[in-house]
């Protein structure tokens, strides 16, 4: 695999939590729409099973809250999740400056 393809894979499908936390930072997100929203906003189509796994882990660890929206399972990023997202942004920004 070419280096750029490996890099793109690692920062997209390899780090789905970043995209999930970002989606839920401003509003409730219906879980069933997560894959579609990631595709629309970030331009790649993640694996549905991986999305479910990431949602489960982020909820259990307190980074996402369990919500209901239009009678469907939904989530919203918690304060803990927002702090983690900001830490990731800061780290990425510092790394890009060094590159």
Predicted features by range, described:
Residues 71-88:
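Basic, amphipathic "hinge/linker" alpha-helix immediately C-terminal to the N-terminal HTH DNA-binding motif
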Residues 83-99:
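Amphipathic alpha-helical dimerization/coiled-coil segments
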Residues 28-39:
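Short acidic, hydrophobic short linear motifs in intrinsically disordered regions
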Residues 1-27:
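Short alpha-helical segments that sit at the start of domains
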Residues 59-70, 76:
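Beta-hairpin "wing" of winged helix-turn-helix
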Residues 44-60:
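Short amphipathic alpha-helical interaction segments
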């Amino acid at each position: 695999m070419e280096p750029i393809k490996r890099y793109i894979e690692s920062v997209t499908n390899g780090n789905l939590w970043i995209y999930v936390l970002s989606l839920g930072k401003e509003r409730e997100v219906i879980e069933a729409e997560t894959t579609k929203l990631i595709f629309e906003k970030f331009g790649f189509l993640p694996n549905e099973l991986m999305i479910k796994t990431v949602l489960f882990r982020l909820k259990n660890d307190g980074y996402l809250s369990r919500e209901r929206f239009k009678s469907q399972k939904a989530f919203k990023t918690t304060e803990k999740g927002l702090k983690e997202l900001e830490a990731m942004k800061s780290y990425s920004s510092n790394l890009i400056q060094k590159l």
